[in-house]
């Protein structure tokens, strides 16, 4: 049994990250799922969706058949998100449903993903949810066959969560959810340590895949008829910075992916601090790199940005946005915004509203601040009432929706003009 430790998870070192290839499942584990149905329920971000594609493929190599409904599944695995309390509540609510099912028939229940990397979650699983059969984290998906095998053979709760990130494991099988659009991991982890964010603890230090492996994956997708790839990472703009002597960055990678012949390229998520002029040039000069930029601002207040540890100012963010809009025609700009961060004043919130007005985002993901155990922000005094936070969120959403409607109307007019042109010629 191995349980998570957030103190260890925070530590960073300069140890070289090894690349492990030729993933294999032991022959005796390839039969344990024969004639059994599995269901994987995924919560959270695109990284989790991509992880679930690996998990599903591993289970099918072990003989399991994909099911649709948890009511008739033999194995249910929850791939979880730790970014907000709401995600926690959904998962524990689902565990309650699964417990009820398990009381009437055999059922294997597993939990993985970012929640599994949290001490408080695993402690609760061990003490109050003993019906959960196995738990593993974000760093050891490739160990799923062995973990599941032990859980079945030993008939007791199997917990194997690595606090520290491991090697990069290539060649894990994948079951793509879409025949035309694909997720492609380019890196794992994050070293930014924003004060409110649990991700650097749950996903580990930044580790970039080698360009050769990324480009090979994209080329295979092109050959298989895929039309669109989304390059994934917690902070894709920092790609390559973790590899010593690696003179190759996100702009270089975007340029090379564009040359593979894939028709459409997206990337998420970008941190404003690492967005370079070279990246802007590559997006501008390559038509198959879509002019879609997700650029989380989180707050428009310099005071709050500093408390968040975001490492940029309102002014530098706006300078970047203006540069993007000047260089990339028809850019679609989206963002993330948190309201109700500890001790956010009316003035701070008004700064956020004003940056929305200046940027005119096409869309935004907006949230009330959710404290995460183990992060610095969770220890900050919070004197803002829930009523105030909810009122601010509604006011922000009204403004965001106003600019979203403007964006939709512009798009509609362009489509009508294009349709009229095509009809004439």
Predicted regions mapped to residue ranges:
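Proteins enriched for Cys/Gly/acidic motifs involved in redox and nucleic-acid/cofactor modification
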Residues: 1-239, 315-326, 350, 354-358, ...
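Anionic-ligand binding region
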Residues: 378-381
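Conserved SAM/AdoMet-binding glycine-rich loop
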Residues: 106-111, 118-120, 223-349, 357
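A glycine-rich phosphate-binding loop feature that marks nucleotide/adenosyl-phosphate handling sites
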Residues: 338-341, 412-416
């Amino acid at each position: 049994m191995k349980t998570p430790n957030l103190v260890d998870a925070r530590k960073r070192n300069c140890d070289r990250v090894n690349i492990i290839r030729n993933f294999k499942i032991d022959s005796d584990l390839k039969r344990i799922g024969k004639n059994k149905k599995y269901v994987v329920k995924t919560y959270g971000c695109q990284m989790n969706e991509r992880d679930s594609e690996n998990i599903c493929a591993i289970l099918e190599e072990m003989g399991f058949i994909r099911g649709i409904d948890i009511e008739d599944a033999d194995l249910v695995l929850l791939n979880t998100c730790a970014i907000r309390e709401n995600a926690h509540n959904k998962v524990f609510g689902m565990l309650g449903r699964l417990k009820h099912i398990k009381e009437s028939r055999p059922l294997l229940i597993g939990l993985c993903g970012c929640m599994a990397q949290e001490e408080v979650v695993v402690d609760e699983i061990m003490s109050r949810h003993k019906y959960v059969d196995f738990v593993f984290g974000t760093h050891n998906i490739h160990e799923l066959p062995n973990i599941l095998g032990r859980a079945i053979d030993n008939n007791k709760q199997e917990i194997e969560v690595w606090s520290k990130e491991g090697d990069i494991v290539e060649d894990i099988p994948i079951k793509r959810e879409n025949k035309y659009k694909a997720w492609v991991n380019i890196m794992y982890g994050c070293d930014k340590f924003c004060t409110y964010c649990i991700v650097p603890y749950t996903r580990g230090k930044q580790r970039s895949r080698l360009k050769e492996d990324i480009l090979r994956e994209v080329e295979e997708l092109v050959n298989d008829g895929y039309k669109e790839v989304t390059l994934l990472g917690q902070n894709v703009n920092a790609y390559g910075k973790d590899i010593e002597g690696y003179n190759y960055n996100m702009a270089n990678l975007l340029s090379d992916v564009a040359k593979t012949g894939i028709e459409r390229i997206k990337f998420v998520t970008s941190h404003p601090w690492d967005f370079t002029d070279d990246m802007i040039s590559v997006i501008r000069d390559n038509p198959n790199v879509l002019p879609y930029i997700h650029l989380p601002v989180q707050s428009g207040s310099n005071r709050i940005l500093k408390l968040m540890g975001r490492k940029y100012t309102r002014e530098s963010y706006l300078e970047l946005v203006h540069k993007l809009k000047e260089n990339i025609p028809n850019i679609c700009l989206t963002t993330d915004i948190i309201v109700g961060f500890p001790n956010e004043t009316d003035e701070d919130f008004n700064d956020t509203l004003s940056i929305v007005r200046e940027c005119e985002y096409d869309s935004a993901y907006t949230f009330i601040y959710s404290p995460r155990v183990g992060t610095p922000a969770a220890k900050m005094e919070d004197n803002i009432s829930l009523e105030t936070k909810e009122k601010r969120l509604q006011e922000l959403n009204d403004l965001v929706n106003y600019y979203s409607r403007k964006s939709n109307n512009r798009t509609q007019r362009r489509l009508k003009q294009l349709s009229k042109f095509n009809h004439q010629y």
